[in-house]
């Protein structure tokens, strides 16, 4: 299965759907779904996902190279892994999504969207994770969902972690730093993301990794992702990652800006970078007689987007943690 990406983009079913690699077994589970199981018993399970948004291609190319290294035997596998290319149709078309944003649909939220390829795919991915985690006895469960951002950022690489009732494990946060993340953002409320679903329903240590700028296939400079790629290689092979990195800055979400109607106005332009700071009292958005202002001494914006559909998030406001 050394042509997983090509098969996914073409929508082709492989002639052979299971086989042996270098020290592991593989099974093709459906378009964009590949399970890898080491020959030796392991108690660690990992979801590696990319392409939930079809225009975010660099992480997909990165996973393709990791798979090639595994198949060639140059990389040893020490985890049970489910590789997920999230939205094959959008990836093939080179667009963010075909109908609706899948990363708002998980945890059953797809039921509140008009039926589409994305709602069906979200349901399929939920079932795939349920099957994957229930078929093993993993003591450790991780989910790394790889993305690139639409706009520029004061932190080139950062992670967004779902709301979690239990403390985050230190080795997981340390690995995120070793993977080159400059900042970590901690959600305080549930959401419809893929990582929130895996964390809430399966207890996985989950993170959405934002790794740079969204570009089409073939236009990515993968050397910009070398730190993350090396950390993933070390993780898969069970090698300790470097500790010679600056710990990521930490932020928590303090509020969400939501667009409810066509009267909505967001006072940030297309050049506003992620993690831009705003002082207390700054007017961020208006909608009719409702005004959204900064309530803390300093807040930082994440994912500002004035053109989202009504009812969706137009931005997150963050507070820096000590």
UniProtKB/Swiss-Prot annotation:
Protein's UniProt keywords contain Membrane: no
EC numbers, comma separated: 3.5.1.96
**Stored CDD domains:** M14_ASTE
Report the cofactor remark.
Answer: Binds 1 zinc ion per subunit.
Catalytic residues, per the record, are 210
Which co-factor is required? Zn(2+)
Q: What are the binding positions for Zn(2+) in this chain?
A: 53, 56, 147
Kindly tell me the pathway this chain contributes to.
Answer: Amino-acid degradation; L-arginine degradation via AST pathway; L-glutamate and succinate from L-arginine: step 5/5
* InterPro entries assigned: AspA/AstE_fam, AstE_AspA_cat, Aste_AspA_hybrid_dom, SuccinylGlu_desuccinylase
GO terms for biological process, alphabetical:
arginine catabolic process to glutamate; arginine catabolic process to succinate
Reading the lineage from the top rank, the first entry is Bacteria
Q: Name the job this protein performs.
A: Transforms N(2)-succinylglutamate into succinate and glutamate.
NCBIfam families cross-referenced by the UniProt entry: arg_catab_astE (TIGR03242), PRK05324.1 (NF003706)
Q: Which family does it belong to?
A: Belongs to the AspA/AstE family. Succinylglutamate desuccinylase subfamily.
Q: What is the name listed in the Swiss-Prot or TrEMBL entry for this protein?
A: Succinylglutamate desuccinylase
Which source organism does the UniProt entry give? Answer: Salmonella typhi
